[in-house]
Amino acid sequence: MAKTLYEKLFDAHVVYEAQNETPLLYIDRHLVHEVTSPQAFDGLRAHGRQVRQPGKTFATMDHNVSTQTKDINASGEMARIQMQELIKNCKEFGVELYDLNHPYQGIVHVMGPEQGVTLPGMTIVCGDSHTATHGAFGALAFGIGTSEVEHVLATQTLKQGRAKTMKIDVQGKAAPGITAKDIVLAIIGKTGSAGGTGHVVEFCGEAIRDLSMEGRMTLCNMAIEMGAKAGLVAPDETTFNYVRGRLHAPKGKDFDDAVAYWKTLKTDDGATFDTVVTLQAAEIAPQVTWGTNPGQVISVTDNIPDPASFSDPVERASAEKALAYMGLKSGIPLTDVAIDKVFIGSCTNSRIEDLRAAAEIAKGRKVAPGVQALVVPGSGPVKAQAEAEGLDKIFIEAGFEWRLPGCSMCLAMNNDRLNPGERCASTSNRNFEGRQGRGGRTHLVSPAMAAAAAVTGHFADIRNLK
């Protein structure tokens, strides 16, 4: 029987499935950070349990960390406690921790792939909703809650029901300058922010195959923003070349044997999906969100939509509420909207290719008066590579702030946040009310588009920048 990639991954990890019961899955990798793990470790301690597979569990600090100093006290009392608890718990339970002083420290979904912790064919979980990022490797990766974190720590297994399947086919080639971020925002614009609910999404088509691994990670990172459980891209030579030689990747003959298996991880001819969505890559322009969910998105050349143009009454009401919160008037060109802050970073867009794209726009230009622009590399290795390439100097010379790795302004859990009413062009993944700070107004864009907003002071079409 022909199977989808998701069905192959799921079935390969079923440990036990009783009749009319939820299947029990084996978990290959468990990624841990400081926010969703303290209660889970406390639960182990309370019941006298150990971490079942400490060698398959990897921890880092990212959500709460300061991006201006490596001082654990810099982000406030709650953050300090969470980070100290992680240090204590990892030491007690034998889990490898990339703490603030470790060269590999960074955002969990950047650190995993770059260290070869993430490999094709795996099941990967983390107490974080953007765990879908790792699906770019052809791994079944999804976020879990703190009680599930405890269960995986204790058993290396998790009960999971089967999801429905969705194929998103992005046909043809994308135009020059169109990035994975533009593609995924255009997809969510078409499906809506709940269009993938109950599904695992597989991204297919020529435009997807053309993406680098970093682009594919951006794509899968935002699968959750269309309501999907996880996102997948089938592994290919691009995947194998990225993984080869990384710290935790197989070596020598083991790697060759792994690749032989990984090549079987693709949807069979004749396999059927519950839902199929098709887009033409050539029609995708640079994207900018205008509202308070990622599905409220338009091309940079468009005008802010009129709520009356939405036939669905729920969408119309949502648009009215979003425009009021965002302080926008329908009908005005998006390029007339001025910004106060720019954030280039997050688990969506803080890898080396993202920073190169932003630096290309920033080079020889200056951040517009009155705009604060932050560039936050996703990890220690990304920061080191960017500095070796001189990208930090380009940003600093242009007036951007060059920061230490961390989740930063993606979410208001550290010192990097918006003040009420401030408008931000952000490369992150969520534009919900208050996501970047109470009363903050978030517009999601690609790294190049964020840099363009920084130097012009408003949203600008990168295709027209001279």
From Swiss-Prot:
<dbReference type="InterPro" id="IPR004430">
    <property type="entry name" value="3-IsopropMal_deHydase_lsu"/>
</dbReference>
<keyword id="KW-0456">Lyase</keyword>
<feature type="binding site">
    <location>
        <position position="407"/>
    </location>
    <ligand>
        <name>[4Fe-4S] cluster</name>
    </ligand>
</feature>
<keyword id="KW-0432">Leucine biosynthesis</keyword>
<comment type="similarity">
    <text>Belongs to the aconitase/IPM isomerase family. LeuC type 1 subfamily.</text>
</comment>
<feature type="binding site">
    <location>
        <position position="347"/>
    </location>
    <ligand>
        <name>[4Fe-4S] cluster</name>
    </ligand>
</feature>
<dbReference type="GO" id="GO:0051539">
    <property type="term" value="F:4 iron, 4 sulfur cluster binding"/>
</dbReference>
<dbReference type="InterPro" id="IPR018136">
    <property type="entry name" value="Aconitase_4Fe-4S_BS"/>
</dbReference>
<comment type="pathway">
    <text>Amino-acid biosynthesis; L-leucine biosynthesis; L-leucine from 3-methyl-2-oxobutanoate: step 2/4.</text>
</comment>
<keyword id="KW-0411">Iron-sulfur</keyword>
<dbReference type="GO" id="GO:0009098">
    <property type="term" value="P:L-leucine biosynthetic process"/>
</dbReference>
<keyword id="KW-0100">Branched-chain amino acid biosynthesis</keyword>
<protein>
    <recommendedName>
        <fullName>3-isopropylmalate dehydratase large subunit</fullName>
        <ecNumber>4.2.1.33</ecNumber>
    </recommendedName>
</protein>
<comment type="subunit">
    <text>Heterodimer of LeuC and LeuD.</text>
</comment>
<dbReference type="InterPro" id="IPR015931">
    <property type="entry name" value="Acnase/IPM_dHydase_lsu_aba_1/3"/>
</dbReference>
<keyword id="KW-0479">Metal-binding</keyword>
<dbReference type="GO" id="GO:0003861">
    <property type="term" value="F:3-isopropylmalate dehydratase activity"/>
</dbReference>
<comment type="function">
    <text>Catalyzes the isomerization between 2-isopropylmalate and 3-isopropylmalate, via the formation of 2-isopropylmaleate.</text>
</comment>
<keyword id="KW-0408">Iron</keyword>
<dbReference type="GO" id="GO:0046872">
    <property type="term" value="F:metal ion binding"/>
</dbReference>
<feature type="binding site">
    <location>
        <position position="410"/>
    </location>
    <ligand>
        <name>[4Fe-4S] cluster</name>
    </ligand>
</feature>
<dbReference type="InterPro" id="IPR036008">
    <property type="entry name" value="Aconitase_4Fe-4S_dom"/>
</dbReference>
<dbReference type="Pfam" id="PF00330">
    <property type="entry name" value="Aconitase"/>
</dbReference>
<keyword id="KW-0028">Amino-acid biosynthesis</keyword>
<keyword id="KW-0004">4Fe-4S</keyword>
<dbReference type="InterPro" id="IPR050067">
    <property type="entry name" value="IPM_dehydratase_rel_enz"/>
</dbReference>
<dbReference type="InterPro" id="IPR001030">
    <property type="entry name" value="Acoase/IPM_deHydtase_lsu_aba"/>
</dbReference>
<dbReference type="InterPro" id="IPR033941">
    <property type="entry name" value="IPMI_cat"/>
</dbReference>
